[in-house]
Amino acid sequence: LLADRFTQKSLLDELNLSTSPWCLLKDKNQWTEVFKNVGEKVVVKRRTGGYDGRGQWIITESNQNDITDDLFGEVIAEKFIPFDYEVSIVGARFKNGEKRFYPVTHNLQQNGILRYSVTDISFPQQESQQIQAESMLGKIMDKLEYVGVMAMECFVVGDKLLINELAPRVHNSGHWTQLGCAISQFELHLRALLDLPTPSLQPIAPSVMVNLIGTEHNPQWLNTPFSQLHWYGKEVRPGRKLGHINITHPDKTVIIQQLEKLRHELPEAVSYTHLRA
């Protein structure tokens, strides 16, 4: 059900949960209706597969022919949302219906790929976003009678969350829990499946997860204090997630200092100074 964006978005509409306006794109004769009712700029996404920016196109009237005939019926069109930033939440539902949630995590994407995730319960709007996200994801898991870990990605627009996508599994944006929480998302998934007692999920300290993308392994990463390296052992390819580094510390200034040192050892430098907010 959730592997198909058509049935996933249909579920969100059925539950009356906020998401971007959308439609199933069946044939090229729909374009006039799409631009009128969905939006003047839309994001066309494959119904199945496609991730990290693959299988997605930003379409306006000027480039609608980029969607070739073989794609119709296999894609949906969503309104392009000029969001403020992106967040996600990872939670789990147990067999008895109980649920546990991690704090909402802030995410930075570059070229459609998650670069890093930041968790800090002192962020502005954190409390209101947490309430919204838990309610939305909880309704979805209850409707599906789901057992295990599920992630929900959202756009933030003002003080509202719009659901972007659901992932019925452990999630890249939840990797920070391996160092920043007493119970990781992997352990939480097992606890839910085995119906084991589980306390509330309290973060140890502010945390950042940095994805290692399209780069060879660098032993110097191990010199980063207050960190934990996870290397996947995959073949190195451009744009491929090959590992990640978690950094956790009570003082955000310390985290930023380590990130600034670390970014010079990565192929695509990212500025972390805005994390001071």
Predicted regions and their residues:
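Short amphipathic alpha-helices in soluble, non-transmembrane regions
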Residues: 256-264
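Active-site "cap" helix and flanking loop/linker of ATP-utilizing ligase/carboxylase catalytic domains
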Residues: 131-152, 157, 168-215
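Short beta-strand-to-loop capping motifs
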Residues: 59-61, 93, 212-214, 247-250
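An anion-binding loop in the catalytic cleft
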Residues: 238-249
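Glycine-rich active-site loop/lid that clamps phosphate-bearing ligands
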Residues: 203-206, 210-237
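Protein kinase-like catalytic core scaffold
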Residues: 100, 150, 161-165
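Active-site nucleotide/adenylate-binding loops and adjacent lid/helix of ATP-dependent enzymes
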Residues: 2-88, 92-140, 263
